[in-house]
Swiss-Prot record:
This is CD-NTase-associated protein 6. It comes from Pseudomonas aeruginosa. Changing K78A: No longer prevents second messenger synthesis. Regulates complex assembly in a CBASS antivirus system. CBASS (cyclic oligonucleotide-based antiphage signaling system) provides immunity against bacteriophage. The CD-NTase protein synthesizes cyclic nucleotides in response to infection; these serve as specific second messenger signals. The signals activate a diverse range of effectors, leading to bacterial cell death and thus abortive phage infection. A type III-C(AAA) CBASS system. It comes from the Bacteria. Keywords: Antiviral defense, ATP-binding, Nucleotide-binding. ATP binds at G75, T76, G77, K78, T79, S80. Oligomerizes. Homohexamer. Forms a 1:1:6 CdnD:Cap7:Cap6 complex. Belongs to the AAA ATPase family. Pfam families: AAA. GO terms for biological process: defense response to virus. GO terms for cellular component: chromosome. GO terms for molecular function: ATP binding; ATP hydrolysis activity.
Length: 304
């Protein structure tokens, strides 16, 4: 049986994982990201247009590059959303055999002059192009600022010229692939969109912000996490209907989805008795962990 995803040494340099799509585990990721459904719908629609409209319309009419950029604070679920998006797109085309390639940008960078540029060019012109020629392909470019750094903000004295050349290579390859491979979609993510080169941003068909969750989303994330734990520790199941739970959920505003789930883990570890028997977890344990998490965020922000 072929393993999904493939993540071994046989993959080309720069490719971290390769998935056959659709894949239910990726669909679960899509469902786990709690955000405005209208935003999800728009994102999915944009990705589908890449495969229905882009191949049939001249680029002089619609200058589509096949690039979507997801931006937002760390922990908001951009990478999971991108993976889930790939599944949902493939699910929309039942007759086509889609593939998801995950790029690991840090394996492409090198201190040796010219090596980063060559590695980037080889990845795009060979590995990605070959996959796109074989069938519809979605490429996840996580932390895209690593490969497409803003050249206007880089000092040639502090940063090797190779970084500039790597960004040049990404832009050149995106243009070539957009021209030759209309059944190819890049989904990029960035925690620091201000660090992404403006020429890369201009090539994006959509730049979508993945925001921190609001009050209702915070509550939904917290309930989902507690319900999952309740399958193993039934006593936790009563917390979502407990007194002050809504207040507790409201206090999560300002935290990202990942941090909210970690808050629950921290609450379980707040007291030895709760750690021994998680059924004893209380709303007050949760509120204490939330206050601590927000205090740490506040201190971290002051240090920057």
């Amino acid at each position: 049986m072929t393993k999904n995803p493939s993540s071994d040494a046989t993959l080309p340099k720069g490719i971290h994982r390769s998935w056959k799509l659709p894949d239910k585990s990726l669909g679960d990721l899509w469902d786990s990201i709690v955000m405005d459904e209208a935003i999800k719908k728009q994102l999915l629609s944009q990705a589908i247009v890449n495969f229905t409209v882009r191949p049939k319309v001249e680029r002089t009419v619609l200058p589509l590059h096949g690039v979507i950029l997801l931006v937002g604070p760390p922990g908001t679920g951009k990478t999971s959303l991108a993976r889930g998006l790939a599944h949902r797109v493939a699910e929309s085309f039942s007759s086509a055999k889609f593939r998801l390639l995950e790029v690991e940008p840090h394996t492409l960078t090198s201190s040796a002059m010219g090596k980063t540029q060559r590695a980037v060019a080889d990845l795009f012109s060979q590995s990605i192009a070959e996959s796109a020629a074989a069938g519809p392909t979605i490429v996840l470019l996580d932390e895209v600022e690593t490969l497409a750094a803003d050249r206007a903000k880089l000092s040639l004295e502090a940063n090797p010229v190779d970084v500039h050349r790597a960004t040049d290579a990404v832009l050149v390859q995106l243009d070539m692939l957009a021209e030759r491979n209309p059944h190819l979609l890049f989904v990029a993510t960035s925690n620091f969109p201000q660090a992404v080169d403006s020429a890369f941003l201009s090539r994006c068909d959509m730049v979508m912000e993945v925001p921190l969750p609001g009050k209702d989303a915070c509550k939904q994330i917290l309930v989902d996490c507690l319900n999952g734990l309740a399958k193993t520790f039934p006593g936790i199941g009563k917390l979502s209907s407990a007194h002050q739970f809504d207040v507790c959920a409201g206090e999560c505003v300002g935290l990202d989805g990942r941090a909210i789930r970690k808050v629950v883990a921290n609450a379980l570890a707040a007291d030895p008795q709760v750690a021994i028997d998680p059924n004893k977890l209380s709303v007050e344990h949760l509120r204490s962990a939330i206050r601590q998490a927000k205090q740490m965020r506040l201190q971290g922000g002051k240090q920057k």
